[in-house]
Amino acid sequence: MRFTTGRLVMTRGIAHEIAASEDFGIFVTESLHRYLDCDWGDTCTEDKALNDESVINGEGDILAVYKKDGRTIWFKTEWDHSYTTVLFPEEY
């Protein structure tokens, strides 16, 4: 399965952390690859099913959660798949 992410953007918090830590940048990149492969990471089972449905239908929000070394990031694609944001949960 593949889907359209639209424009990929990140919050200032994510951009700041990438600039400060090469390891964090690698984590974001690896998570993006997982997201594009429809590997929803640490997302709950119900949201994984909703994500799969959104991919099949070509519309609907998609949200995935990835965790590493005590850090959590989200990837959120808007309902119309026009853009995807990488963010920290507290930035939502």
Task: Tell where the protein language model's regions lie, with residue ranges.
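Compact soluble domain cores
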Residues: 1-64
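Short, compact, well-ordered microdomains
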Residues: 54-92
